[in-house]
Amino acid sequence: MESLLKLLLLFITVCHRVSAATPSSPPPSSAPSYPEEALPTKSGYLTVNSTTGSAIFYAFYEAQTSYNKTPISESPILIWLQGGPGCSSMIGNLREVGPWILNQELTLDANPGSWNQIFGLVFLDNPIGTGFSIARSNQEIPRNQYDIAKHLFIAIQKFIALDKSFKNRPIYLTGESYAGKYIPALGYYIIKMNSQLPKERRVNLRGVAIGNGLTDPEIQVSTHAINSFYLGLINEKQTALLEKLQMNTVGFIRRGKWSEATDARNRVLDTLTNMTGLATLYDFRRLIPYQNAVVDKFLNNVEVKKALGVKEDKFFERCSNVVGGVLHDDVMKSVKYMVEFLVKNTKVLLYQGQGDLKDGVPSTLAWVKTMRWEGIPGFLEADRKVWRVDGKLAGHVQKWKSFYPCCCVECWASCA
């Protein structure tokens, strides 16, 4: 439990500090570049299909310092997966939790809240066809969570083989948004595979952490109207209209009309955006949208690609419409049963930014309450405690005190 709480503390610290990056890269030049000090420890490709050559791109940053007298070579490794579906983890790397934050001038600033301060940090462009990852054909892009997890498992095994010190290091899976499906599916797959493999081929999974995740879409899509109403963002008439659209979405889910359900959810979110006039549903307090187009500009530079081990002709797209289209029918399918499996077999952390109207606190707690897990009554009765970092309010934590804890964290500042 102690190791999970240390991980949790780092997550919350990032919520406060990620926006306070200090400039340390060279001034803007005519073309962006990757300063040597900002380069990943390792980056390149992990082949998932030796026949076709399809591969997952990775960028690994070794821990900056040791923690609690643990050598860096033994520190835990966090594997970050972005959402989408079809969005590159280089967004998380360069705009959220990586050691360097990309600014609008296409230069890099040191991130004092980076998650690799005391952990190794791996960013994977998942699934194939996303970001810098390679899919030799659209037909090879996975269409369900099982096949996505299978590719990721192969990639992780190959990553571990890159350095003999990686083999015994604890591994945690983390990410946000649509990774609320990737992470449970991958954790489930790893545990199942580990039970069938010899010790030397197992993945040393120690826990999972899901941020603002889409995990049980049927329940989560039903929370938007009432949540927005009680925040004062919409009135009763608008609430009734939104609830009607939500029930329409649920109807498609229950009839197994998955494509229609995804389209219906998109209508719910579009309607909510239009009703509120918000810049983004990911954080209702923001006055302008997230400025992430800078990631495409930076990563499509030839010198940057060369530095990362990417071919010059590989076009980077931060969110792939092709991958999103392939997984369109998968979006509204629940993986809650996989989380129910995980809480019995490893550590689970759910963390949410308080300002997220899509998959934030009410959305997450709504599906957590319906989990088939003997720990739920204890969890729901547990005290909700104030979380402080350096004496300042960081959020609130609720956990069930058992051998396999399930924690819910609310970030007072947005985690996204």
Locate predicted features:
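Terminal and linker regions of secretory-pathway proteins
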Residues: 1-416
